[in-house]
Amino acid sequence: MTKDEMIQYVSARFSTEAEYPWADENFIFRHQGNRKWFAVAMRVAYQKLGIARDGLADIVDVKCGPLLMDTYRRLPGILPGYHMNKDNWITILLDGSADDELIKELFEISFDITNRRPTAAKKQPE
């Protein structure tokens, strides 16, 4: 899946548009209700990802949760979360190395995990 294909898929599937909060080409997808991010897309040097290759990679970080992390990180095109908490986020290379159906599955997981509303803090007795 390419970056453009990913944008089209996420926009159609989750009824949201890419937001550009920084003065560059990086962008996020977030929930309209709770405003939480469920994906961050970036262009970074392959070498910053630990890949011995010149050039830039289009990537997207999605939230996965620690219980599924090891399973997904073993698959082609999946890396520990770049620039995010590596216990909860994974990076997907958008260079064709990750299976398209896997990418869609990971977006579903990230969307569901981040769609939960935080519980209200318990009020301390006075």
Functional labels for PLM-detected ranges:
Residues 1-126:
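Charge-dense, helix-prone N-terminal extensions
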